[in-house]
UniProtKB/Swiss-Prot annotation:
Gene3D superfamilies: CinA-like (3.90.950.20), MoaB/Mog-like domain (3.40.980.10). NCBIfam families: cinA_nterm, molyb_syn, PncC_domain, PRK00549.1. The gene is cinA. SUPFAM superfamilies: CinA-like, Molybdenum cofactor biosynthesis proteins. This is Putative competence-damage inducible protein. Pfam families: CinA, CinA_KH, MoCF_biosynth. CDD domains: cinA. Disulfide bonds: none annotated. InterPro entries: CinA, CinA-like_C, CinA_C, CinA_KH, Competence-induced_CinA, MoaB/Mog-like_dom_sf, MoaB/Mog_dom.
Length: 414
């Protein structure tokens, strides 16, 4: 089985100015391909050190994947150093040169000479088109090694890898097996607990393989199987999926790359249910999240951010008696907030968020104590309590995701 090394080029990575998210993405994709990544390397924009890294990588890896250093500036040196190392010439790629020329011509701007560097490639390489930028990527087989050169910006790198580089890697892997992969997304359970629940499957795994990843307040499980036929590979994945669902299916919210908020929004659109939100400590995060999706104006009618007791009473019309007797961190307050925003905005669903963001306590409640109210036309209003930690922004983000999960659970049941 081929081994790969990912080499990220850029001094900004070493200085901590940019996080190397490219390596994580490529590693996950290669794992699904059955290609093992044994090394991640980060090197600055220094010719001597980059050459040294290339030589080290060639001694231990079959596939060298570079990210970064393909741009027009003096510190973009990746292809120049690799070309010299392989004793290859640099040549101009017509497609990318025309693309750059057209860009500047259409804007009536003069193209500086250094921009042409983005259209320069190593001779004998397969050009990887950059659909979202100008720097050409490259795929090259030389001396029993495969070299893949990708741009640094993730918005350019990811589509280039997915559309052009990865199919080439798969075609040359020599493995004629069919590969099937499925991503499962869980909310409300930690990675350590999920991994513990699946421990016997993970420890004894051969085919399929199971990998767990901690996401943003969620856990991702990836099942990957190989077989001689698509049907057999799919069956292997399905059997493992069913076993995982048997153990932790109550925490599953979806599959693939669809986020929880995107999934819930699609469900609301399909059912033509309108929604509004009243937010206290989340300060509009729920509304900002749901507003990200196209067509949302059909169902999202508006909302209110009522951070203080005064605005909860004056704008959201929460009863002063409820606030005085029960406090703002209470089921009663959460219910009234949800009911009132639904009534004021004339929506089918009203959701509310109130609680203690942290790190300090409030009304005797520890940081991370939250209440989410859910009011649905024709149903009894409910309030749900959750207790998180002391991290303020983590609590706010998690509460918003919890709100989407509560809506999904209601929609699934009704």
């Amino acid at each position: 089985m081929a081994s790969a090394e990912i080499i990220a080029v850029g001094t900004e990575l070493l200085l901590g100015q940019i996080v190397n998210s490219n390596a994580a993405f490529i590693s996950q994709e290669l794992a699904a391909d059955g290609i093992y990544v044994y090394h991640h390397t980060v090197v600055g924009d220094n010719p001597a050190r980059l050459k040294e890294v290339i030589e080290i990588a060639e001694n231990r890896s079959d596939i060298l994947i570079f990210t970064g250093g393909l741009g027009p500036t003096e510190d973009d040196i990746t292809k120049q150093i690799l070309a010299a190392h392989l004793q290859k010439q640099l040549v101009e790629d017509e497609y990318h040169m025309n693309k750059i020329n057209e860009y500047f011509t259409s804007r009536n701007r003069a193209m500086t000479e250094n921009n042409k560097l983005q259209a320069v490639i190593i001779e004998d390489s397969i050009v990887l088109n950059n659909d979202f930028g100008f720097a050409a990527g490259m795929y090259l087989r030389e001396n029993n090694h495969t070299y893949v050169l990708l741009p640094g910006p993730p918005s350019e790198m990811k589509p280039m890898f997915t559309s052009y580089a990865n199919p080439l890697l798969l075609s040359e892997s020599g493995d004629q097996n069919i590969l099937e992969s499925k991503i499962m997304r869980f909310f409300g359970i930690g990675e350590s607990q999920l991994a513990a629940d699946l421990n016997d499957l993970i420890v004894t795994q051969v085919n399929p393989t199971i990998a767990t990843y901690a996401g943003d307040n969620e856990v991702v499980v990836r099942i990957t199987a190989t077989a001689k036929t698509k049907e057999e590979a799919s069956r292997l994945v399905k059997d493992t999926e069913e076993e995982i669902l048997r153990r932790d299916g109550t925490f599953l919210y979806g599959y693939g790359e669809v986020s929880l908020s995107e999934l819930v929004t699609a469900m609301l659109l399909e059912k033509e249910l309108t929604i509004s939100a009243a937010e206290s400590f989340t300060a509009g995060l729920f509304q900002a999240e749901i507003a990200r999706f196209p067509g949302i104006s059909k169902i999202f009618k508006g909302g209110m951010v009522t951070y203080s007791e005064e605005t909860k009473q004056s704008i959201l019309q929460v009863s002063p008696q409820v606030i005085k007797e029960k406090g703002v961190v209470s089921a009663e307050c959460a219910k009234e907030m949800a009911e009132n925003v639904s009534r004021l905005c004339k929506t089918d669903i009203g959701i509310s968020f109130t609680g203690v963001a942290g790190p300090d306590s409030l009304e005797g409640h520890p940081a991370g104590t939250i209440w989410i109210g859910l009011s649905v036309k024709g149903y009894e209003t409910e309030a749900f309590q959750f207790v998180y930690g002391r991290d303020r922004n983590h609590n706010r983000r998690r509460a918003v995701k919890q709100g989407f999960q509560l809506i999904k659970q209601f929609l699934d049941a009704n």
